[in-house]
Amino acid sequence: MNQNQLLTSRQIIMLHIGFSIVYISGLFIPLMENDSAQHASMAMRMTLNNDFLHIFKGENPYLDKPHMHFWLAALSMKMFGISHVAYRIPALLCLALGAFSTKKLAEILYDNEHTGYLASLIFLSAQTIILSAHDVRTDAVLTGFIIFSIWQFVRFIKTQHISSAILAGLGTALAFSSKGLMAIVIIGFCILAYLLYSRDWKKFFNLKIIIVALSFAIGIIPVLYAYHVQFGDEGIRFILFNQSVNRLTASGFEETSPDYFFFFHTLLWAFLPF
């Protein structure tokens, strides 16, 4: 083993196998209340009615989270039957995409394959990621697409490959289709931080960025169409503007006492054991 390496190749393989067992075994745990079971029932309704353009929460039209999480869960139920295992499969696959993208991103940033493996292990071992694979909501799907998009953006800035520009736009579109504009904000801040560090502004702001914009615009057409079919122009306004504004202004949320240490104590458990 190289003295600069924290883990041997054997240890890395064994740890990845161990985490794979943890995540796969989590497929068979009964769904938690409230959101996981609720989202599963909403996806099940799509499957049974063969209707992927309308989302209902009980008997009421659901104008909140975008369609991607429900689409993936419903398609999985179509393929594997209606069960909590089928509901969790897309989340598990998206987290696998997130772990792989984390590895590849770390390799680009540090020019070191070993660091990439360590980064993927840190990602897989974080308590919040393990929880998102078991208590499945939109988080697992969103996380996988966001990390994939950031990896492709950084790869595009480094290499100027057209394929990375297309994948960066599509990855951002998938993240948007999972959570709305907040996903774009997260990706944007990450890329801005990288550009401030690398100073590669000209490699980002050039004509090829139009390819990113076009692939993003094409990628969000399905979710915009679904919102328009169910809610008309109100649905388009909601996903493009109102949803994010409501979250930033806390409109529609119950008023509670502010917890100024919320992110501090949340991060303490979310990234255990690191």
Question: Each PLM stretch: what is its role?
Answer:
Residues 3, 108, 149-165:
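Membrane-interface transmembrane helices that cradle and orient dolichyl/undecaprenyl
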Residues 89-110, 148:
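Transmembrane-helix motifs of polytopic, lipid-linked glycan transferases
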